[in-house]
């Protein structure tokens, strides 16, 4: 009908105007797949890369990762650095919390000899360093840990108890305006780690909020909510955390997806466990009783042994990873989150959980 055609033309013109004014990806159809033309860096978790829809975090954009204490925020960003360094990219870590552990970073695969690190005195100094690194065009990934620790100079120089209403929010707002364009031009990924605070007097709805005002929420292309949802035990000893990440905002693909994976203490994200779980889900790995097989060859009895096989055979792990990415990303396949419920018989057969 003519009316429908006119509406379509008007809609197309409106969408074009919005994208021209606010940038590509500011509006899209929920089921639309426009993510493959965006350069990304892996998060170190296959299921999270798939949930993001583009295979990782987008270059040239601002990303916010927030969650409660000890939920895996810094671990996730260190895994991003390790993945970027494997691709030959230059990374920087702005340690505003003064809490970065180089030994732990090295265990996660970070090349600490080639990682730029700064421990700024004030929030303004941290953000100026970010801007200088971005404008150089030579740094590919910058991590700021964390927004809550970016203390304005006036607050540091003042007395404890002085009121500095909205100072940090104004500082972040100004920095976002300055950084957003430079990041796009330099194709630099900037990740802000943030903490959670509680709003006072909220009776209905979610009382949680993040620090630093609203500017970061608006300028971030991706916002990830990371939570610890359980413990992983070997006997009575806790050896890791079950982790869930929700993609609460996504400008490069459809938002609101989530991923579950395991973070092993001292090792990081259990990527091989994800390969086994997703491989079984999508029938790339056969499971008969306790035995796992790949391409007709047995790779281990129990999930722990199957993971060890993939660790000892990185070529097979890479092949399986590529097949899963091709299926779940490039063909628009749907991620089925691997959960412990599907592998209850594994828990009965072995005390080792991954």
Swiss-Prot record:
Tell me one GO biological process term.
DNA repair
Major localisation: cytoplasm
Instruction: List UniProt keywords, sorted A-Z.
Output: ATP-binding, Cytoplasm, DNA damage, DNA recombination, DNA repair, DNA-binding, Nucleotide-binding, SOS response
Pfam families from the xrefs?
RecA (PF00154), RecA_C (PF21096)
List locations, semicolon-separated: Cytoplasm
What does the entry list as the binding residues for ATP? Answer: 67-74
Task: Output the Gene Ontology cellular-component terms.
Answer: cytosol
Could you confirm whether the keyword Cytoplasm appears in this record?
Answer: yes
Which GO terms of the molecular function aspect are on file?
Answer: ATP binding; ATP hydrolysis activity; ATP-dependent DNA damage sensor activity; damaged DNA binding; single-stranded DNA binding
Superkingdom of source: Bacteria
- Function (record text): Can catalyze the hydrolysis of ATP in the presence of single-stranded DNA, the ATP-dependent uptake of single-stranded DNA by duplex DNA, and the ATP-dependent hybridization of homologous single-stranded DNAs. It interacts with LexA causing its activation and leading to its autocatalytic cleavage.
Q: Which PANTHER family does this one have? A: MITOCHONDRIAL DNA REPAIR PROTEIN RECA HOMOLOG-RELATED (PTHR45900:SF1), RECA (PTHR45900)
Q: What's the family?
A: Belongs to the RecA family.
Q: What is this protein called?
A: Protein RecA
Lineage of producing organism: Bacteria, Pseudomonadati, Pseudomonadota, Gammaproteobacteria, Enterobacterales
């Amino acid at each position: 009908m003519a009316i429908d055609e006119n509406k379509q033309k008007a809609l197309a013109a409106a969408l074009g105007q919005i994208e021209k004014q606010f940038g590509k990806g500011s509006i899209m159809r929920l089921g639309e797949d426009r993510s493959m033309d965006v350069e990304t860096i892996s998060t170190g978790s296959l299921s999270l890369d798939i949930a993001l829809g583009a295979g990782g975090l987008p270059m040239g954009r601002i990303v916010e990762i927030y969650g409660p204490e000890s939920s895996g925020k810094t671990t996730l960003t260190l895994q991003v650095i390790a993945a970027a360094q494997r691709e030959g990219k230059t990374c920087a870590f702005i340690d505003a919390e003064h809490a970065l552990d180089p030994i732990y970073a090295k265990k996660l695969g970070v090349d600490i000899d080639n990682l730029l690190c700064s421990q700024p005195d004030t929030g303004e100094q941290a953000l100026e360093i970010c801007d200088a690194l971005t404008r150089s065009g030579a740094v590919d990934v910058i991590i700021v840990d964390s927004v809550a620790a970016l203390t304005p100079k006036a607050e540091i120089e003042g007395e404890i108890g002085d009121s500095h209403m909205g100072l940090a929010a104004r500082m972040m707002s100004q920095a976002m305006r300055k950084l957003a364009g430079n990041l796009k031009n330099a194709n630099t990924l900037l990740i802000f780690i943030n903490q959670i605070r509680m709003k006072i007097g909220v009776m209905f709805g979610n009382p949680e909020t993040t620090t630093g005002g609203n500017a970061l929420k608006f300028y971030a292309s991706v916002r990830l909510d990371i939570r610890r949802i359980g413990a992983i035990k070997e006997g009575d000893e806790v050896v890791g955390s079950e982790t869930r990440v929700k993609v609460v905002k996504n400008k490069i693909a459809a938002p609101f997806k989530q991923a579950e994976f395991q973070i092993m203490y001292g090792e990081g994200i259990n990527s091989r466990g994800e390969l086994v779980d997703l491989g079984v889900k999508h029938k790339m790995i056969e499971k008969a009783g306790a035995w796992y097989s790949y391409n007709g060859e047995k790779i281990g009895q129990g999930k722990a042994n199957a993971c060890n096989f993939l660790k000892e055979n990185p070529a097979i792990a890479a092949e399986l990873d590529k097949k899963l990415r091709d299926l779940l990303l490039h063909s628009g396949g749907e991620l089925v989150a691997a959960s412990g419920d599907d592998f209850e018989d594994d828990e009965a057969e072995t005390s080792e959980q991954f």
